[in-house]
Amino acid sequence: MAKKESFFKGVKSEMEKTSWPTKEELFKYTVIVVSTVIFFLVFFYALDLGITALKNLLFG
């Protein structure tokens, strides 16, 4: 039982050392991630359309 208590005390200690982002930082990072995902979604969709068009042009 002492091992469990020691473990959870260690977890609590480490969680207190963790630096969490502010609301502004969290919002900024969320916008960056969502923007990047949308960019790559559009990029790969356009790439897929281009490859499909090229395939249809070459092979009918």
Curated annotation (Swiss-Prot):
Q: Which GO terms describe its cellular component?
A: plasma membrane
Gene Ontology MF, one: protein transmembrane transporter activity
- InterPro entries xrefs: SecE_bac (IPR005807), SecE_sf (IPR038379), Translocase_SecE/Sec61-g (IPR001901)
GO biological process: what's one of them?
Answer: protein targeting
The membrane spanning regions, by residue number, are 31-51
What keywords are annotated for this sequence in UniProt? Cell membrane, Membrane, Protein transport, Translocation, Transmembrane, Transmembrane helix, Transport
Pfam families (UniProt xref)? SecE
Localization, per the record, is: Cell membrane
Primary residence: membrane
What is this entry's stated membrane topology? Single-pass membrane protein
Q: Which family does it belong to?
A: Belongs to the SecE/SEC61-gamma family.
User: What NCBIfam families does the database record attribute to this sequence?
Assistant: secE_bact
State the function annotated in the UniProt record: Essential subunit of the Sec protein translocation channel SecYEG. Clamps together the 2 halves of SecY. May contact the channel plug during translocation.
The subunit structure is: Component of the Sec protein translocase complex. Heterotrimer consisting of SecY, SecE and SecG subunits. The heterotrimers can form oligomers, although 1 heterotrimer is thought to be able to translocate proteins. Interacts with the ribosome. Interacts with SecDF, and other proteins may be involved. Interacts with SecA.
For this entry, the protein name equals Protein translocase subunit SecE
Organism of provenance:
Staphylococcus aureus (strain NCTC 8325 / PS 47)
Lineage of producing organism: Bacteria, Bacillati, Bacillota, Bacilli, Bacillales
